A protein has these predicted regions:
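Secretory/extracellular carbohydrate-interaction modules
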Residues: 1-91, 106, 249-264
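Carbohydrate-binding surfaces in secreted/extracellular proteins
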Residues: 111-146
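Long, compositionally biased interface segments
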Residues: 212-264
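Short, solvent-exposed beta-strand-to-loop segments that form ligand-recognition rims
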Residues: 135-176
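Short, flexible beta-strand-to-coil junctions
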Residues: 32, 124-126, 188-193
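Exposed low-complexity, polar/acidic, P/S/T/G-rich flexible segments that act as propeptides
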Residues: 183-226
Length: 264
């Protein structure tokens, strides 16, 4: 028993990109076999926010299977300040998507199993120092803005701003723009280890630097949450024949902790 918890794919970017100042990160996710239980599932693209003085924090955006929302489908863009900045939830804008006042990070979004969705994090065109996440249905090519986060601002300043910002009338946050680092994708699952198997597919992992150069990881390294910390022994990550990466629950584990999976 226990929770399937978290398993991650850390991107191994080419050596020439490791010191690049990243300003955009993208990944495509597809829910191939959707959940069949009411537990929460979250499939996300994660980045660190880095400024001149070090790390500001991290953010994650992705699709959720969440029974609080119509059809159990939702999207999220949220994150936390770094420990030396207090570790608080990062402030951000009010989304145009429907949601709940007590959780501005998670919004209703009608994703469907078997469709491909591109997750994208980039500098906000509306607010200086903010980072925007959007999701695009690859069949319709329709992008949907989720919201903006302000990782570089003091949390106390933006906590007030968060509740009054609306698209089109925001004042500039005024933070230094910073850049992105350490991209990864992951699954976080709050189901039992023995619940019906779920499969998601990741592809088109891409990072773009401030010179406009697009970088693809050479490989990913696999990480599983330890069983003693609530992880399951029957989660797995494996490549497919189309160049994608599958994350699967309730299956045999073919790629162990720390394994590398080449992408070229």
């Amino acid at each position: 028993m226990g929770a399937a918890s978290s398993f991650h794919l850390f991107w191994q970017l080419p050596a020439a990109a490791r010191d690049a100042r990243l300003v955009e990160v993208l990944a495509v996710v597809e829910i191939l076999v959707p959940p069949r239980v009411p537990a929460l599932y979250f499939w996300a693209l994660q980045v660190d926010f880095v400024g001149p003085a070090g790390m500001w924090g991290g953010g994650h955006t992705g699709l959720q299977w969440n029974r609080r929302y119509p059809g159990n489908t939702a999207v999220n863009w949220g994150g936390y300040a770094s420990a030396d900045r207090g570790g608080a939830v990062l402030p951000g804008s009010i989304s145009a998507l429907p949601g709940f006042d007590d959780d501005p990070n998670t919004l209703s979004y009608p994703w469907s199993a078997g469709r491909r969705y591109r997750l994208r994090v980039h500098r906000s065109p509306d607010i200086a120092g903010a980072w925007r996440a959007e999701v695009t249905d690859m069949e319709s090519s329709k992008p949907t803005v989720i919201r903006d986060l302000w990782p570089g601002q003091p949390v106390a300043t933006n906590r007030i701003r968060r509740y009054f910002w609306r698209a089109g009338n925001a004042s500039e946050a005024g933070a230094e723009p910073g850049f992105l680092a350490r991209p990864m994708v992951w699954s976080e699952v709050f189901a039992e280890c023995g619940d019906p198997s779920v499969t998601v597919r990741w592809s088109e992992l891409t990072a773009v630097d401030e010179e406009g150069i697009a970088w693809r990881p050479d490989a990913v390294s696999v990480n599983y949450q330890a069983e003693r910390d609530g992880g399951c022994q029957n989660t797995d990550t494996r490549p497919d024949l189309g160049g994608g990466l599958l994350q699967i629950t309730n299956t045999s584990r073919a790629f162990p902790q720390g394994a590398g999976i080449p992408l070229h």
